[in-house]
């Protein structure tokens, strides 16, 4: 099964999407889903003494402006594993530039976790948590000599727009 092409983007898009975990929370290993091999591969180990602040992965059947599937971060208390599918509620969007390309990231919470039942928008997340996530993406590639830039957070409505946009880009490229 191709976890990118064979799974719907979610059960109730854009309000609820599937996140296919590539990198568990707390990991320094950067795994990527290799679309052609249909397997997870170790892309690299982070050069810095930092770790992923949330579950990190992709939304199936999406394509974003950087030519890759739409990235998604899912806030969790405990890490899962590569390949885990999390039914997720988008709550925000981190605007970001990576290597000159727009590389925004959806921030979401797991539908099945009662700790996040009342979280509907990034305004429901402590400001410091958002700063930690943005700081990770501002610094995690510095020792590789690569530049990333975060441009700020937007709320759930912008996240929904980004999800719909990425589904449309995928549809135009692969389904027409």
Curated annotation (Swiss-Prot):
CDD domains: pyrophosphatase
Subunit structure: Homohexamer.
Keywords, ordered alphabetically: Cytoplasm, Hydrolase, Magnesium, Metal-binding
Protein origin, superkingdom: Archaea
Enzyme Commission (EC) number: 3.6.1.1
Protein's UniProt name: Inorganic pyrophosphatase
PANTHER family given in the database record: INORGANIC PYROPHOSPHATASE (PTHR10286)
Reactions catalysed, as given in the entry: diphosphate + H2O = 2 phosphate + H(+)
The keyword Repeat belongs to this UniProt entry's keyword annotation: no
Cofactor: Mg(2+)
Subcellular localization(s) per the UniProt record: Cytoplasm
PROSITE patterns per the UniProt record, alphabetical: PPASE
Similarity field: Belongs to the PPase family.
Transmembrane segments: none
Function: Catalyzes the hydrolysis of inorganic pyrophosphate (PPi) forming two phosphate ions.
Binding positions for substrate per the UniProt entry: 30, 44, 56, 140
BP term (GO), one: phosphate-containing compound metabolic process
Sites where the protein binds Mg(2+) 1: 66, 71, 103
InterPro entries per the UniProt record, alphabetical: Pyrophosphatase, Pyrophosphatase_sf
HAMAP family per the UniProt record, alphabetical: Inorganic_PPase
GO cellular component terms, semicolon-separated: cytoplasm
Gene Ontology molecular functions: inorganic diphosphate phosphatase activity; magnesium ion binding
Cross-referenced Pfam families: Pyrophosphatase
Positions that bind Mg(2+) 2: 71
